Protein backbone atom coordinates (compact mmCIF):
# COMPACT_ATOMS: atom_id res chain seq x y z
CA UNK A 1 0.00 0.00 0.00
CA UNK A 2 2.78 2.43 0.94
CA UNK A 3 4.75 1.35 -2.10
CA UNK A 4 1.75 2.05 -4.34
CA UNK A 5 1.39 5.51 -2.80
CA UNK A 6 5.08 6.28 -3.40
CA UNK A 7 4.77 5.07 -6.98
CA UNK A 8 1.79 7.36 -7.59
CA UNK A 9 3.61 10.33 -6.05
CA UNK A 10 6.66 9.64 -8.22
CA UNK A 11 4.46 9.35 -11.33
CA UNK A 12 2.71 12.63 -10.52
CA UNK A 13 6.04 14.40 -10.05
CA UNK A 14 7.38 12.96 -13.31
CA UNK A 15 4.25 14.18 -15.10
CA UNK A 16 4.64 17.64 -13.53
CA UNK A 17 8.25 17.82 -14.73
CA UNK A 18 7.20 16.77 -18.26
CA UNK A 19 4.58 19.53 -18.27
CA UNK A 20 7.10 22.11 -17.04
CA UNK A 21 9.58 21.11 -19.73
CA UNK A 22 6.86 21.43 -22.38
CA UNK A 23 5.93 24.86 -20.99
CA UNK A 24 9.59 25.92 -21.09
CA UNK A 25 9.55 25.41 -24.86
CA UNK A 26 6.72 27.91 -25.23
CA UNK A 27 7.48 30.27 -22.36
CA UNK A 28 7.80 33.36 -24.55
CA UNK A 29 4.50 32.66 -26.30
CA UNK A 30 2.84 32.09 -22.93
CA UNK A 31 3.93 35.54 -21.70
CA UNK A 32 2.50 37.06 -24.90
CA UNK A 33 -0.75 35.18 -24.34
CA UNK A 34 -0.94 36.43 -20.74
CA UNK A 35 -0.70 40.06 -21.82
CA UNK A 36 -3.32 39.51 -24.54
CA UNK A 37 -5.66 37.99 -21.96
CA UNK A 38 -5.13 40.87 -19.54
CA UNK A 39 -5.89 43.38 -22.28
CA UNK A 40 -9.38 41.88 -22.67
CA UNK A 41 -10.28 43.32 -19.24
CA UNK A 42 -12.76 40.54 -18.46
CA UNK A 43 -13.08 38.05 -15.63
CA UNK A 44 -12.55 34.81 -17.59
CA UNK A 45 -9.45 36.05 -19.43
CA UNK A 46 -8.07 37.36 -16.12
CA UNK A 47 -8.60 33.92 -14.57
CA UNK A 48 -6.80 32.25 -17.48
CA UNK A 49 -3.93 34.75 -17.29
CA UNK A 50 -3.51 34.03 -13.58
CA UNK A 51 -3.63 30.26 -14.21
CA UNK A 52 -0.83 30.63 -16.77
CA UNK A 53 1.17 32.88 -14.44
CA UNK A 54 0.99 30.22 -11.72
CA UNK A 55 2.39 27.69 -14.20
CA UNK A 56 5.16 30.11 -15.19
CA UNK A 57 5.97 30.65 -11.51
CA UNK A 58 6.26 26.88 -11.06
CA UNK A 59 8.50 26.73 -14.13
CA UNK A 60 10.67 29.54 -12.73
CA UNK A 61 11.02 27.66 -9.44
CA UNK A 62 11.94 24.48 -11.30
CA UNK A 63 14.57 26.35 -13.34
CA UNK A 64 15.87 28.41 -10.41
CA UNK A 65 14.75 31.62 -12.16
CA UNK A 66 12.42 32.99 -9.50
CA UNK A 67 14.01 36.46 -9.58
CA UNK A 68 13.41 36.82 -13.32
CA UNK A 69 9.79 35.73 -12.93
CA UNK A 70 9.29 38.13 -10.02
CA UNK A 71 10.60 41.04 -12.09
CA UNK A 72 8.10 40.27 -14.84
CA UNK A 73 5.29 39.87 -12.32
CA UNK A 74 6.22 43.21 -10.72
CA UNK A 75 5.95 44.81 -14.16
CA UNK A 76 2.42 43.45 -14.49
CA UNK A 77 1.54 45.00 -11.11
CA UNK A 78 2.99 48.34 -12.26
CA UNK A 79 1.58 48.31 -15.78
CA UNK A 80 -1.92 47.31 -14.67
CA UNK A 81 -2.02 49.06 -11.29
CA UNK A 82 -5.56 50.36 -11.88
CA UNK A 83 -7.06 46.94 -12.62
CA UNK A 84 -8.13 45.99 -9.13
CA UNK A 85 -9.91 42.80 -10.20
CA UNK A 86 -6.75 41.51 -11.86
CA UNK A 87 -4.54 42.47 -8.91
CA UNK A 88 -6.93 40.79 -6.47
CA UNK A 89 -6.83 37.57 -8.51
CA UNK A 90 -3.03 37.69 -8.59
CA UNK A 91 -2.83 38.07 -4.81
CA UNK A 92 -5.42 35.33 -4.23
CA UNK A 93 -3.27 32.98 -6.34
CA UNK A 94 -0.22 33.77 -4.20
CA UNK A 95 1.38 35.90 -6.92
CA UNK A 96 2.61 38.78 -4.77
CA UNK A 97 4.37 41.94 -5.83
CA UNK A 98 7.78 42.46 -4.26
Spans of model-derived segments:
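C-terminal structured domains
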Residues: 1-98
